[in-house]
């Protein structure tokens, strides 16, 4: 068997990625989230496939087909809630994975980091178009508001919006194409994941100490397969608690009302995992400015390698930057809270302060802290 897994063209690939892969001996549980994301992706593709077998992408029957899945299909309710809450688990793992990358300086593996940003940027529209499919009130109005943002693009904006809608409003054509996008994008994500892994295994993983670990590597199997298995079991436990006890806790009650173009919900908001970006968008009074800030809030991740002036790898031995990092995380949670609040005082003011702080920490304060730490520790070229 050993000879076969090392010589067979296909098994050799799996062997080099998951069995004999040299891995730093000291990576902590924060490194588990990559494999958890892989499990989440598999769960989403499988549950999504079974949902697609019973779903109809037509404005007159979409809402009813989702109700039919929950009421009449064998374990349809389970598949539907696994898919809906699986998306939330996906984004929780994604945020932790990116947060770990920032904390431990993984952004210095440029190719892996940039593919990761592309993965994040592909996952966001996938989740957005998926949220539109049940064709509830929040699905319809969320689609209307978010797609309308493209009209802020000078000259081609309005044409672009109508082109995406397939008409003069969000209607049957929009729903059909969103279903098509939602079906194809996870497979594009899977392809990007393979590229992400390919680049990661070119350089090897980082580790908590931030030092070169080439002299101290252990095989991935059995050490990290067992460790990842524990993570997977914990993830599945949390997911099943969500699905079986609190299936609607992360959703919006408005989405249990069929879409009605004549009745606008009191507060239009996206799913919870987009609220931080939505808060940044709303905090700028100008439409185009808001859209640019929204895009930059994600693309700013690409600036981390450029803005890094520290002579140390990661934040483990950098208390000033560590302090700023945790302020950044707290600020992100505040933005998430603000995104779900109505547009009124004091929420607008808190949102504006948090949005400024979000960019200021990354662009100004963290590089400044790095320079101060370099000086204190006399780390010069």
From Swiss-Prot:
Residues annotated as binding a ubiquinone: 201
Cofactor annotation remark: Binds 2 heme b groups non-covalently.
GO cellular component terms given for this protein: mitochondrial inner membrane; respiratory chain complex III
Needed cofactors: heme b
Keywords linked to the UniProt accession: Electron transport, Heme, Iron, Membrane, Metal-binding, Mitochondrion, Mitochondrion inner membrane, Respiratory chain, Transmembrane, Transmembrane helix, Transport, Ubiquinone
InterPro entries: Cyt_b/b6_C (IPR005798), Cyt_b/b6_C_sf (IPR036150), Cyt_b/b6_N (IPR005797), Cytb/b6-like_sf (IPR027387), Cytochrome_b (IPR030689), Cytochrome_b_C_euk/bac (IPR048260), Cytochrome_b_N_euk/bac (IPR048259), Di-haem_cyt_TM (IPR016174)
Annotated compartments: Mitochondrion inner membrane
GO biological process, one term: mitochondrial electron transport, ubiquinol to cytochrome c
List of residues binding heme b b562: 83, 182
Pfam hit, one: Cytochrome_B
Transmembrane segments: 33-53, 77-98, 113-133, 178-198, 226-246, 288-308, 320-340, 347-367
Membrane topology: Multi-pass membrane protein
GO terms, molecular function: metal ion binding; ubiquinol-cytochrome-c reductase activity
Chain residues that bind heme b b566: 97, 196
Miscellaneous comment text of the record: Heme 1 (or BL or b562) is low-potential and absorbs at about 562 nm, and heme 2 (or BH or b566) is high-potential and absorbs at about 566 nm.
Family: Belongs to the cytochrome b family.
Subunit structure: The cytochrome bc1 complex contains 11 subunits: 3 respiratory subunits (MT-CYB, CYC1 and UQCRFS1), 2 core proteins (UQCRC1 and UQCRC2) and 6 low-molecular weight proteins (UQCRH/QCR6, UQCRB/QCR7, UQCRQ/QCR8, UQCR10/QCR9, UQCR11/QCR10 and a cleavage product of UQCRFS1). This cytochrome bc1 complex then forms a dimer.
UniProt function note: Component of the ubiquinol-cytochrome c reductase complex (complex III or cytochrome b-c1 complex) that is part of the mitochondrial respiratory chain. The b-c1 complex mediates electron transfer from ubiquinol to cytochrome c. Contributes to the generation of a proton gradient across the mitochondrial membrane that is then used for ATP synthesis.
The name this protein goes by in its record: Cytochrome b
Organism: Thomasomys daphne (Daphne's oldfield mouse)
